[in-house]
Amino acid sequence: DGNNADHYTSSHAEQADELARFIEENHGAFLTNKVYFDAFKRDNSGTYPDVRKRISELLKKGQLLINYTGHGNTTAWSDEYVWTQTDILQSTYTKLPIWVTATCDFTRFDDVNTSAGESVFLNAKSGGIALFTTTRVVVSSGNSALNKELYRNLFERESDGRARTLGEAMMETKRKLSGINKLNFILIGDPALRISYPEYKAQVTAVNGKAISDEPFTFKALEKITVEGEIL
């Protein structure tokens, strides 16, 4: 998300892409879904109805985590209002994700009006299980640094194979960063929660009786194959 009023243009999309690559390269057990505004048609009002539709579809299917990087405010994501407080209040999905919002003011909980981020957490029929979110204006470079550090801490396994708690992930993230931008990020939710990370790994050891090596396997159409593996 970028606009003509600032110099960010594609910066937010590039930052989001970097986060997706981190998951794909380091935590391949998780699937990433990316929603690019410009991959969809923009209507006459200046917004992207199909982006809103796609976000809604993904949330209904169930997501571990939803991350937005870009412009925003207390009631909406982006200058194009692709996801708004009204959308949040009207949602009916039941599988609640963790929300990460690297955008300005999304959860300004000390304002007289209820913010969109608060609506995510207070929503009785939908919303989110927890939020790593913002209470004030934040800057793009600082958001990117915090987002990357947060991902490293959220998805890193402890010695017992479990993920860190959300509170520990936020604590370690802020501890490793300097500057004041981090002070505008908060965790809303139970700090003792952990992401739903598989405690074990599945490893393929052989295909058609042949041990796994650096040599590629060749399969024919409709061929039946036997895959062997182990749980680590």
Predicted segments, located by residue:
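Cysteine-dependent hydrolase recognition
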Residues: 1-232
